[in-house]
């Protein structure tokens, strides 16, 4: 099999796994609270990446592996900051899922893809006209998807929008530090930090018990092991042989799979108006990722 074809298949599987994870998160919270879900799933995700790091080191595939104590300190510090941002974003997403559907959550969360180049303007990066048009289209699509009669918006949709904004800053920070870091180690640290912060919220605001956690072991294991460890590993391997623009397009299908699995697995369908909103948002997401055409001279 051609390397790029294999990479595309891995990235498509990655998007499918992440899309189904929205269902796992939603179903898991029928038994445990958002903080408990976060603490358990991200702890498992961190554990799964430990052997992945070991294998990558043995194969010589690790990139920017920390060689000195200073490198390790910088890696831990960057991972901690990523973990705080990930905790804030996923906590809003978890609470949002209590008051919105899986499909809506998937598409609204995916707005970070449109937001990232806009935030880049703050750091001196230019955003072309197409990016702003895509942002406007995404806002209109979100209006069709989330705004009901009487201009009412579900609280869960607003929380998920906040999640998308936080994921935007999370991605921008990773983009700034990742060229100097080992990506898998960075992710492993952020998972454990996110789990620790979620555990604090779990013990302060919730009343976790092993019976409830055991009752939703499958959603927790799926969200932690598959969405965290397996999908992330697929992403790392797949992106090696696929052009960045194509990789982003494939992974943005996560929102489509979230809506599809929400409908198939738990019967959360979307109305015609909401489907049109999804289509507009997805088109905006795709167009925002296409490379800018270079002008001659």
Question: Each predicted region: which residue ranges?
Answer:
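Helix-helix packing/entry segments at the starts of transmembrane helices
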Residues: 15, 38-40, 105-111, 174-195, ...
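C-terminal-most transmembrane helix of multi-pass membrane proteins
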Residues: 42, 50-51, 57-58, 216-218, ...
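Hydrophobic transmembrane alpha-helices of multi-pass small-molecule transport proteins
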Residues: 49, 127-147, 167, 198, ...
């Amino acid at each position: 099999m051609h390397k790029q074809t294999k990479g595309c298949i891995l990235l498509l599987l990655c998007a499918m796994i992440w899309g189904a994870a929205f269902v796992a998160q939603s179903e898991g919270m029928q038994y445990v609270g958002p903080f408990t879900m976060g603490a358990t799933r991200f702890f498992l995700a961190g554990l799964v990446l430990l052997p992945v790091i070991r294998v990558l080191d043995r194969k010589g595939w690790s990139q920017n592996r920390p060689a000195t104590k200073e490198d390790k300190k910088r890696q831990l510090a960057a991972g901690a900051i990523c973990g705080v941002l990930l905790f804030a974003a996923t906590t809003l997403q978890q609470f949002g899922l209590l008051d919105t559907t899986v499909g809506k959550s998937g598409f609204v969360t995916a707005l970070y893809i449109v937001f990232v180049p806009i935030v880049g303007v703050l750091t001196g990066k230019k955003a072309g006209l197409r990016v702003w048009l895509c942002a406007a289209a995404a806002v209109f699509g979100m209006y069709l998807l989330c705004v009901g009669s009487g201009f009412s918006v579900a609280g869960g949709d607003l929380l998920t929008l906040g999640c998308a904004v936080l994921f935007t800053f999370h991605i921008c920070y990773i983009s700034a530090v990742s060229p100097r870091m080992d990506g898998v180690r960075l992710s492993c640290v952020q998972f454990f930090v996110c789990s620790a912060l979620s555990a604090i919220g779990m013990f302060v605001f919730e009343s976790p018990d092993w019976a409830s956690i055991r009752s939703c072991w499958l959603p927790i294991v799926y969200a932690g092991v598959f969405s965290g460890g397996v999908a992330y590993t697929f992403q790392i391997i797949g992106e090696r042989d696929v052009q960045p623009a194509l990789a982003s397009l494939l992974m943005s299908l996560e929102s489509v799979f979230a809506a599809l699995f929400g409908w198939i697995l738990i019967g959360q369908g979307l109305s015609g108006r909401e489907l049109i909103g999804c289509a507009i948002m997805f088109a905006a997401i795709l167009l925002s990722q296409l490379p800018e055409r270079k002008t001659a001279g």
